[in-house]
Structure formats: C-alpha cells, structure tokens
Amino acid sequence: MLKKLKIKLQYLLPQHALTRLAGWAANKKAGWLTQQVIKIFASYYRVNIKEAQYTEFSAYSSFNEFFIRSLRSDVRPIAAGDNILVQPADGTISESGRIDKDKILQAKGHDYSLEALLAGQSLLAKEFENGQFVTTYLAPGDYHRVHMPCDGVLREMIYVPGSLFSVNAFFAENVPYLFARNERVICIFNTAFGTMAQILVGAMIVGSIETLWSGPVDSQRKGIIQRWVYPDEGSEAPIILKKGEEMGLFKLGSTVINLFVSNKIKLASHLQNGSITRLGEILGEAPH
C-alpha cells in the first residue's frame, strides 16, 4: 500500500512547481538559518566536508553554494593511461552493461530505447546500438559536479524537457521509461573511443543542470527540445575537454548516463549494481 502511494504521489505532485520552489530556496542567503540547514543536511547525509575545497560551513552563504562545493584537487586522483576511461562522478552504479541492440536496462523488468532516451534522434541512436552503458545515481550527499571520462571534443548538446520523477533505486524499479521521460541534457562527444554520450538527467527538486560551456541549460524551461551543434576539432574555437575535467553540475542531485559505441571499450568488472564509485576511478578501458 505504502509503495503504491509513493508512486502515485510522484504522478500527482506538481513536479515543476516544487522544483522551482526548491531552487529558489536553495539560492537564498539566510545567514544563521542557512548555516543550520547545511549542517543538518551534512550530518544526515554524512557529507565528508574535509574533502571540500572549503572545509568550514561558514564559507557557504547559500545551500546551493554548499551543494555544488568543489573538492580539493588531491582527493579524487584520475586513473592514468590513454586507454583508460574514468568514472565521471561520485555515486552509485544503478545499472551498467551491454546495450541489447537498442534497449537499455533501467532496472529489473524495465528497459527503454536509445531513440527515446536521445529524444528521437534515430541516426544518433544507431551509433550506440549494441554498445555499452553505465548509469550512475548521485545521492543527495554526493559531490555533484560531473567530469569527463576521457578526452573529448563536444559535438552537440540537446536539451530535452520532460517530467521530474525522483530517480533513486525505488523509482527506477517502479516508474517505466523513467530516464527517457525525465528532463535531461544530452552531451555528445567525439573521442578516441568513438562517439560518447554523457547525459545529465534531471529529477524532482533538481534546481538546475549546468554545463561548463553554456551555464544553466534548463533555466528557461521553454518546454521544447533545443539542440546546439559545435565546431569540429581543427575548426575555429572547438570545445575540447580533457579526461577528469569538469563538464557540468547538478543543483540538487540526479543521474548521469554514459553511452559508448560497440566494440570500443570493456567496462571494469567492479561496476556492479549498487556499487559505490568515485570520480576518477577506472570505468573501463580500450582492449589492446
């Protein structure tokens, strides 16, 4: 009964209005009250503030400043090697493995199609058929900046409006086509491992999704799909990002999905469902 009620509430709640309210509140600078909220949040979610660039709670004047805190440069070493890809974020592996032609596993008993995830871009979807995928869930207490698994040249970015269902394990197991329904920002890169997609999926009370090159992508939330195409390497002003470099962030949590083309990489064996991962750890490698 409680399970059904939790699911029903997700459909009934005014998702976008609640998200706007949460974003507004998280940006407020309320002095002592803000400090108390940050301390309670950090204690409840066991945030290791000693890893942050600024280790005093008083350094953060709003909740969002704390939530998108930067880490010290020495706490997340980036695995070396030209053939090595690294985990793009702190989080928990929700699912990973082979894409079954065009189907991606969401949770036991649930899958969704590449074309649905990629906003109907059928030619783009075909590039990833029978490839590999990794879905990483960022819990509220995790570090919420997202980095590059490998060197890449940005090819295009697509903003897809959508629902804002919660994306934790419970809802992944109970809301069909969750990641293909939720608001998301799709970033496509050309890499030494072929085309790579890094998709930042929104959720309930995710105030904003931002990228390094564009700032808040979803700030206007016009309700239409928007697409941007970027210069190739060798052209004027390409956007080139290095392995381990920051590429985006979430203001209040969510999920990162990585897609890789077929026969280019082998995912690391430790990527088991429910396993805790850290930015910079080995995600996979190119077979020799």
UniProtKB/Swiss-Prot annotation:
**Which terms under GO biological process does the entry name?**
phosphatidylethanolamine biosynthetic process
Q: Which domain of life is it from?
A: Bacteria
Enzyme type, top EC level = lyase
Broad class of where this protein is predominantly found: membrane
The catalytic residues are: 90 (charge relay system), 147 (charge relay system), 254 (charge relay system), 254 (schiff-base intermediate with substrate)
| Record family assignment | Belongs to the phosphatidylserine decarboxylase family. PSD-B subfamily. Prokaryotic type I sub-subfamily.
What is its biological role?
Catalyzes the formation of phosphatidylethanolamine (PtdEtn) from phosphatidylserine (PtdSer).
* Protein's recorded name: Phosphatidylserine decarboxylase proenzyme
Organism lineage reads as:
Bacteria, Pseudomonadati, Pseudomonadota, Gammaproteobacteria, Enterobacterales
